[in-house]
């Protein structure tokens, strides 16, 4: 196989990668080792993590939203096999759209130490073998045809053909690998793997979350995607003590999991990237500013070198003026300013395309300009739509924030790509079915949904009919626009260029090699984009 000099090849044995920089002198060695041939006036609902934790009786926190439609037309968008993210690049955040990845789904008997349904069903159904629709936590039903049957479990929810709805588990390595293969096929760069601090002190919970992290690492290395860790410190039971636990967990992951040694772990300015969500929110119980300041200082300059990071804070949407969802203590301004990166949570902060335009002008552009003056990387949130009917026990409408066939998300992508001070975007979230922000493959047609319960398909908005992989394809197009491979354009993409087939993993053991080889096509020579006033090559 022909290999570009800018690419690393990765072999994985028990999650311990062997890496070779591919150069003229090492291609043969690589082949031998790896066997390779003003603010918006609009009604918005924002829930806190504690509210969701109590609602769902689960460990993790969620933060969410609402909204309303405009008009659009959506036909197919073509994807292409993604090029491996160059592991030698120490500025891997440049010109990237990176997805949040929950990886929080499970079922009894899947091998996870928690041994129950997680995030598909609320208690009491979370503890039964065949749960029913009354305790659903999700509005979207993922497609099931590409997962191994052993990686799914039947529920008690009926399909129209008399079978039962099946659900996958993130504990299964091939499930996570499949998701990363979809990213690879559609040119999506990678993920922030979210690690919830709630419940992490419990051995079984910590092992479950570490199991998923291992799955994501392995999948990233096999597919050439990149990944980094995102800690979530939200949750009704969490206090300021969580900051000490977070530091201890990071040390453990660096020392025992060698997490930052992965060639696909995202690095910026020569440092591993770490994201901490929940800083400064009114709805989050972490309020001791001295402890927060101390933790940030430790990560940036006081920790032993192997634990230091490029630190991104997941912060409230009104962080800059300390109002609304942000704590008002002036000390938080200094905390925000001390971060390497600022990622405001924007899900639900607008509910129409026009209200997004207003929010973008009045808040996001001003946020990004402020960050540019401080030398802080600014990562706005992009999201496709929203619905949490089942999570809220029917008290919120189904399809609360319509997707408009993708036009709602594309408008955000266009505006972000056109903004001179925006160079990295957080896409919420790759696999989020609880609040229906998922971009991975979900049921496209209402007729194909389970017949029990209330569900949301991609054709819910009248006049829109898109395939199950539509948002994967749309994200890939947005990435190409963002890194300069196609022009920045407001026009919604409607062409369908030829798309490479999805690469399927082996159905054998989790540690076996995939049955297909990495794509060998050379990428188009990248253009350059402004990064905080400094021209930087595409990562």
PLM region spans:
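Compositionally biased, low-complexity intrinsically disordered regions
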Residues: 8, 39-42, 533
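Cleavable N-terminal signal peptides of Sec/SRP-targeted secreted and luminal proteins
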Residues: 2-21
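Residue-identity detector for glycine
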Residues: 11, 61, 532-533
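N-terminal, immediately post-signal peptide pro-regions of secreted/luminal proteins
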Residues: 20-70, 74-75
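Glycan-processing catalytic domains of CAZymes
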Residues: 61, 66-496
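Low-complexity, Pro/Ser/Thr-rich intrinsically disordered segments
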Residues: 24-27, 494-539
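Intrinsically disordered, low-complexity, compositionally biased regions/tails
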Residues: 15, 65, 75, 86, ...
């Amino acid at each position: 196989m022909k290999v570009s000099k800018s690419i690393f090849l990765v072999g994985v044995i028990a999650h311990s990668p062997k890496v070779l920089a591919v150069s003229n002198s090492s291609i043969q060695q690589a082949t031998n080792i790896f066997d390779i041939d003003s603010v918006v006036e609009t009604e918005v609902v924002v829930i806190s993590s504690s509210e969701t934790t109590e609602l769902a009786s689960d460990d993790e926190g969620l933060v969410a939203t609402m909204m309303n439609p405009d008009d659009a037309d959506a036909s197919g968008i073509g994807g292409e096999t993604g090029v491996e993210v160059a592991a030698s690049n120490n500025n891997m955040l440049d010109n990237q759209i990176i997805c949040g990845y929950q990886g929080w789904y499970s079922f009894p008997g899947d091998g996870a130490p928690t041994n129950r349904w997680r995030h598909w069903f609320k208690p009491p159904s979370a503890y039964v073998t065949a749960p029913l629709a009354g305790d659903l936590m999700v509005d979207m039903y993922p497609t099931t045809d590409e997962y191994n049957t052993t990686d799914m479990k039947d529920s008690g929810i009926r399909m129209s053909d008399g079978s039962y709805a099946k659900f996958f588990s993130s504990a299964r390595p091939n499930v996570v690998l499949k998701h990363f293969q979809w990213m690879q096929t559609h040119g999506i760069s990678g993920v922030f793997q979210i690690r919830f601090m709630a419940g992490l002190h419990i051995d079984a919970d910590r092992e479950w979350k570490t199991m998923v992290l291992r799955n994501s690492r392995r999948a990233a290395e096999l597919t050439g995607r990149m990944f980094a860790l995102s800690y979530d410190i939200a949750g009704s039971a969490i206090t300021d003590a969580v900051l000490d636990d977070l530091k201890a967990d990071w040390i453990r992951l660096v020392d025992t999991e060698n997490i930052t040694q992965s060639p696909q772990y995202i690095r910026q300015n020569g440092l591993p990237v770490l994201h901490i969500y929940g800083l400064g929110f009114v709805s989050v119980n972490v309020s001791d500013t001295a402890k927060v300041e101390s933790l940030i200082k430790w990560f940036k300059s006081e920790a032993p070198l192997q634990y230091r990071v490029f630190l991104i804070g997941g912060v409230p949407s009104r962080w800059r003026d300390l109002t609304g969802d942000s704590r008002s203590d002036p000390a938080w301004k200094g905390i925000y300013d001390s971060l390497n990166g600022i990622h405001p949570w924007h899900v639900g902060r607008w509910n129409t395309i026009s209200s997004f335009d207003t929010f973008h002008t009045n808040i996001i552009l001003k946020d990004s300009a402020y960050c540019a003056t401080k030398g802080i990387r600014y990562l706005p949130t992009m999201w496709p739509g929203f619905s949490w009917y089942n999570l809220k026990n029917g008290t919120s409408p189904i399809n609360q924030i319509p997707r408009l066939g993708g036009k709602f998300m594309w408008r955000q992508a266009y505006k972000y790509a056109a903004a001179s001070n925006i160079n990295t975007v957080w896409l919420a979230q790759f696999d989020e079915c609880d609040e229906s922000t998922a971009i991975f493959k979900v049921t496209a047609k209402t007729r194909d949904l389970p017949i029990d319960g209330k569900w949301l398909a991609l054709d819910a908005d009248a006049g829109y009919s898109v395939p199950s992989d539509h948002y994967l394809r749309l994200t890939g197009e947005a990435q190409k626009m963002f890194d300069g491979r196609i022009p920045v354009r407001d026009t919604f993409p409607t062409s369908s260029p030829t798309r490479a087939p999805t690469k399927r993993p082996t159905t054998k053991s989790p540690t076996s090699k995939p049955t297909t080889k990495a794509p060998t096509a050379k990428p188009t020579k990248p253009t350059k984009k402004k990064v905080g006033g400094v021209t930087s090559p595409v990562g």
